[in-house]
Design a protein with these regions (language model features):
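Outer membrane beta-barrel strand-and-loop segments of large Gram-negative receptors
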Residues: 460-472, 506-516, 599, 618-675, ...
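Gram-negative outer-membrane beta-barrel transporters
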Residues: 625-627, 649-734
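Periplasmic N-terminal accessory/gating domains of Gram-negative outer-membrane beta-barrel systems
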Residues: 91, 151, 175, 190, ...
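Short, acidic Ser/Thr/Gly-rich low-complexity loop/linker segments typical of extracellular
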Residues: 139-155, 159
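C-terminal beta-signal and adjacent terminal beta-strands/loops
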Residues: 629, 724-736, 754, 759-810
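Outer-membrane beta-barrel signature, preferentially recognizing the C-terminal barrel domain
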Residues: 236, 408-425, 563-564, 571-629, ...
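Short, acidic, small-residue-rich periplasmic hinge/interaction motif at the N-terminus
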Residues: 23-27, 49, 94, 101-141, ...
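Flexible loop and strand-edge segments within Gram-negative outer membrane beta-barrel domains
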Residues: 355-357, 387-466, 500-508, 586-587
């Protein structure tokens, strides 16, 4: 009987065992999902494991060889979470599997997640034109993002863990692109973007980060390419004062000669035209422009106030396209297309003034008496998506002529010439990139001596010729570190006019070698530091050599997603001085490299600011201080009569400081840009101790600019723009004579202000595109003499100036 009861008890235990195991499996979920309170803190992986075991009584089993137990991990934010969630956060960067062993044991299997390079190119879908500054974002299933921008060749690179990502690409004026990619090894992505309408639309200048873009990565003040004039938009940026077409602009209290213009990296000396309405370059051929001030990327040097990088189109690699433009100053044509489809393309543009053809129909006082033409040409060959070879040619000529011959025939009395040629090669091999270029640039200013000095004949000229070789390397280590270094060599020859009984030209050759190294370190997603140094050896063949060390520093911090704090420092040095004594640049003006005792001009620029990014815009406030050393000025009550410049010029120092604000906002069909700058620019000279610190010629205390546009229809818009600024300091009196010591830097021009209105119409007819622009400059206002010195006979009362432009692309 007793044995029967034992058998029955044994059978009941066997039947009940599966149920018991089922309860323990349920207990496994309970153990892994037990709640635990965690405070925000940092500890090693091993310390976190020990704390979990002590706090919960759970035994953790793991293979120490599979993970870095000494690696420091911070859990933030803290709070209530499950044990499983905490383990995944501790082992972020690992693929984690957790198995339960009763009664309270968790077996943790971890495998390090591999990371790979995701690289690619961003280009326009119809033309294969590479896009510089496109924002590329990779987003994983948890919403975590990795961001970068495409470089000057349209190439981008990101280092991300293996997995599936959504790739988002955005660029101003283009439809955003979204695609999915599975990353299991290094991969290459080609992104082709479609223009929203077509590329010859109105320009919007944005002073830094745009919606959903990278404040710490995007080039400062990037302007998208357009058929309009890019330079005419610079004046909307705070601290920038310029004429109608952006010529002769001043930046943060600096002079006209303190700004450098680069065309595809080639310096264009003394850019500009006789007509202040004519843009510096043919806008139909321009792809984009980047305007640097305050902080200068380490590879840049040569001027102390600003550097403007203008990049030309490479040409359509898929189909032949023609663009014809007729506006008030000039008529232009631009041709582009493939020579070898998807491989070799051409771009040729030419422009010429046309109102001068009607001079014979006008009275002598209303004639233009000048003509302008320029051309751009470019060949681009793609060996591969990341390897390109480009050839560039640029030329411009402005000619001012008068009927001086007895038979009434016109004689050229002033001519400006610019030339630039470049052969460049760029490639990318893994994380290492290289760009190498050879280029030649020249500027000549020629004048008829009979108009400069009585009883003389013939021509005199001044100029600069420059032959350069550059090579630039870049290296990216994951997403944390980016290095850039390079070497530049320049051989320059200056043609300088020597005045006296006879005018003659002397030649001064100069060798210059530059080396630079730049580091960008992203310490965290919120904090980045960029530090670099540029060294220059300036070696004239017949004069003293100079050596310069120019450090650069930029610190940026995002305290929140919508706010950016930044601190910038740049030391710059320029080895060229230029003083203009008339309304026009003449060969007899003071042009001098750092020879004959004229030391290089140097500057340190300090700036700190705050940017706030809104859903449909941004605002920015910054303060700056800039030093200026070895500045030159014409002595009071002085006329230049010969080549002894030391008798007429005095050397001093200066500084400038100010506060700047900028606002950009969109509301449905409305778009507003507003900028204001309060700045002071001072100079002091040892020869005038009694004057102390006086305003510089570039002191403009108050500068206010604004632009408001309204989208009337899908094809048309109306715009209203204006500026108000303090009058500039005078250096001549009302009779155009030099001021005395007592009046030196004491008088100003009146307050300048101007209101402009404009209308634009855009329409596509199949594959044909049309842009019409109409407007009036200075509807009301009091512009400066420089602004109205346009040499056009089409003026209304009060210096009101109409303009119009018609572009047709087919």
């Amino acid at each position: 009987m007793k044995s029967k009861w034992l058998l029955l008890l044994l059978w009941m235990c066997m039947v009940a065992r599966p149920e018991a195991w089922g309860q323990e499996v349920k207990s496994a979920n309970t153990v892994a999902e037990e709640w635990i309170q965690v405070n925000s803190s940092s500890a090693t992986v091993l310390q976190w494991f020990e704390w979990i075991e002590k706090s919960t009584g759970i035994v953790l089993s793991y293979n120490p060889a599979q993970m870095e137990l000494g690696e420091l991990r911070r859990i933030e934010p803290g709070g209530k979470m499950t044990v499983e969630e905490l383990l995944h956060r501790i082992l972020s960067g690992y693929q984690v599997k957790i198995a339960f062993v009763p009664p309270r044991k968790l077996v943790v299997h971890a495998r390090k997640i591999e990371s790979y390079d995701v690289s690619g190119t961003v280009s326009e879908v119809d033309s294969e034109e590479r896009l510089y500054g496109a924002v590329v974002t990779l987003e994983d299933k948890d919403g975590k993002q990795w961001n970068t921008i495409s470089n000057g060749k349209g190439i981008f690179r990101l280092h991300v863990p293996e997995g599936t990502y959504t790739v988002k690409t955005s660029y101003m004026g283009y439809t955003p692109q979204v695609q999915s990619v599975r990353v299991t090894r290094d991969c290459f992505i080609r992104t082709r973007m479609k223009p929203l309408l077509f590329e010859i639309e109105e320009i919007t200048v944005e002073s830094g980060k745009r919606e959903n873009e990278l404040g710490e990565l995007t080039p400062s003040n990037l302007l998208a390419f357009s058929g309009g004039d890019l330079f005419s938009q610079i004046w909307i940026l705070p601290g920038v004062t310029s004429s109608l077409a952006g010529q002769n602009f001043m930046v943060d209290g600096g002079g006209y000669d303190e700004n450098l213009l680069l065309l595809d990296g080639v310096p264009v000396f003394h850019p500009g035209h006789f007509s202040s309405l004519l843009p510096v370059f043919n806008g139909d051929a321009v792809k984009n422009m980047v305007f640097h001030k305050g902080f200068f990327p380490t590879p840049l040097e040569g001027r102390i106030s600003s550097v403007t990088e203008v990049n030309l189109k490479e040409g359509n690699k898929k189909e032949h396209v023609r663009t014809l433009t007729l506006d008030m100053p000039a008529a232009s044509v631009m041709l582009e297309g493939p020579i070898i489809k998807n491989k070799l393309s051409y771009m040729v543009g030419a422009r010429r003034s046309w109102l001068d053809f009607f001079d014979s129909l006008l009275s002598e006082e209303n004639r233009l008496n000048h003509s302008t033409y320029d051309y751009n040409a470019k060949l681009s060959y793609n060996f591969s998506p990341v390897t390109t070879l480009n050839f560039l040619a640029y030329g411009a000529r402005d000619d001012y002529h008068l009927p001086l011959q007895e038979n009434g025939e016109n004689v050229s009395v002033l001519r400006w010439d610019n030339q630039a040629y470049q052969l460049s090669f760029a490639t990318q091999k893994g994380r290492l990139g290289n760009s190498t270029a050879v280029f030649y640039s020249a500027h000549t200013n020629r004048a008829y001596m009979g108009e400069i000095k009585e009883d003389t004949d013939g021509y005199v000229h001044s100029g600069i010729k420059s032959l350069n070789v550059t090579t630039d390397f870049s290296y990216s280590l994951e997403n944390l570190y980016h290095a850039r270094w390079g070497v530049k060599y320049a051989y320059e020859v200056y043609d300088l006019v020597s005045q006296g009984e006879e005018m003659r030209v002397r030649y001064e050759p100069v060798n210059q070698v530059s080396v630079y190294y730049d580091n960008l370190l992203r310490i965290s997603p919120e904090f980045s530091v960029q530090v670099g140094v540029h060294g220059v050896a300036y070696c004239p063949q017949h004069h003293r050599s100079y050596y310069s060390i120019q450090p650069r520093l930029s610190v940026k911090y995002f305290p929140s997603e919508r706010n950016l704090l930044y601190l910038n420092f740049s030391k710059m040095e320029q080895f060229y001085h230029f003083l203009r004594f008339d309304s026009f640049s003449l060969p007899t003006d003071f042009r001098m490299p750092s020879i004959d005792g004229f030391k290089p001009r140097s500057s340190e620029h300090y700036e700190m600011g705050w940017k706030h990014f809104m859903n449909s815009g941004q605002c920015e406030v910054s303060v700056y201080y800039k030093t200026r050393r070895n500045v030159l000025a014409l002595r009071p009550d002085t006329w230049v009569e010969d080549e002894g410049w030391q008798k007429y010029l005095m050397v001093g120092n200066g500084d400038s400081y100010g506060v700047k604000g900028y606002l950009y906002q969109r509301w449905k069909r409305w778009s507003l840009q507003l900028s204001y700058a309060y700045s002071r620019s001072r100079e002091w000279f040892g020869e005038l101790p009694e004057k102390g610190k006086v305003p510089s010629l570039y002191d403009v205390p108050h500068q206010l600019g604004g632009a408001l546009s309204y989208q009337l229809t899908a094809h048309s818009s109306f715009s209203l723009g204006g500026m108000l600024r303090s009058g500039k300091v005078r250096f001549l009196n009302e009779d155009y004579e030099p001021l005395s010591v007592e009046e030196f830097r004491e008088k100003r021009e009146p307050l300048n202000y101007r209101v402009d209105v404009g209308y634009s119409y855009r329409k596509s007819f199949g594959d044909k595109l049309l842009l019409l622009r109409l407007g009036v400059y200075n509807v009301v206002g009091n512009p400066s003499e420089e602004d109205i010195l346009s040499f056009y006979s089409v003026h209304w009362s009060g210096n009101c100036l109409p303009y119009g432009s018609l572009s047709f692309k087919f």
